[in-house]
Amino acid sequence: SDGTQSRTVAWTVFDTGPRKAKNVILFVGDGLSPAHRVAARLLSKGIAEGKSLGKLAIDDMPHMALVATAGSDSIITDSANSASAYATGHKTAANAMGVYADRTANPFDDPRVEPLASLAKRRHGMGIGIVTNTEIEDATPAAVVAHTRRRAAYDEIVAQFFAARPDVLM
């Protein structure tokens, strides 16, 4: 072509669909209340005239929530059933994780609840990562994958990590 010809083309432009999350990070400050954050801020940044002299990195997180928890058998929670509620969206009894607790002798035969991380992996191919500053079999990190009525069953909980195969475990 010599560049003298022109053509008109009609394009139909469609809006893109809603963005889907690539990753979800749930940061759990086990036992971390607003009072603990205030104390950390005052001790690390200093105080003048009743006000903190700086902010913590957590203060700039774009999304944050405070959750009041209660177990299925008590208004007082422990790390196991509160972390299980975060991980599954279902309440359970004290010392239980990922189950509807019953009264049978076997703490591993209770009806199971699928953790949200497992659902995200199964349905959307997302990865599961668990990073903790305590032992992985401790109640808060274990609630991401464990199914038991007995939070102190550490050997069995570790075996459940091998079965769940999280992509990151530190």
Where would I find each of the regions flagged by the language model?
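N-terminal catalytic scaffold of extracellular/periplasmic and nuclease hydrolases
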Residues: 2-170
